[in-house]
């Protein structure tokens, strides 16, 4: 799908301020992302989600993450993720590839 090394760079620049990826990592402003793939929205244990995230009910995978990361507030209206999104498809593909490798 994407380039893991480029995706890691994107994660560090755009995501790491609010998220961790390692097993047992702390929640920050956003939830720890370990185990993200195959998990339903709003399910990271110990993180306080909005009702919008909890009730969205989709399962995170390559396709749902590609859509969400383009415009988080459009995909889940009411999310507290303040990130505007990544418009470039290739950059999102790289990030999703990195997340898949780093969170499982």
Curated annotation (Swiss-Prot):
The modification N-acetylglycine is found at residue 2. One of its GO terms (molecular function) is metal ion binding. Coiled coil: none annotated. InterPro entries: Cyt_c-like_dom, Cyt_c-like_dom_sf, Cyt_c_1A/1B. The keyword Cytoplasm does not apply. Heme c binds at residues 15, 18-19, 81. It holds the Pfam family Cytochrom_C. It comes from the Eukaryota. Keywords: Acetylation, Electron transport, Heme, Iron, Metal-binding, Mitochondrion, Respiratory chain, Transport. It is found in: Mitochondrion intermembrane space. One of its GO terms (cellular component) is mitochondrial intermembrane space. The keyword Iron applies. Binds 1 heme c group covalently per subunit. Belongs to the cytochrome c family. Electron carrier protein. The oxidized form of the cytochrome c heme group can accept an electron from the heme group of the cytochrome c1 subunit of cytochrome reductase. Cytochrome c then transfers this electron to the cytochrome oxidase complex, the final protein carrier in the mitochondrial electron-transport chain. This is Cytochrome c. The gene is cyc.
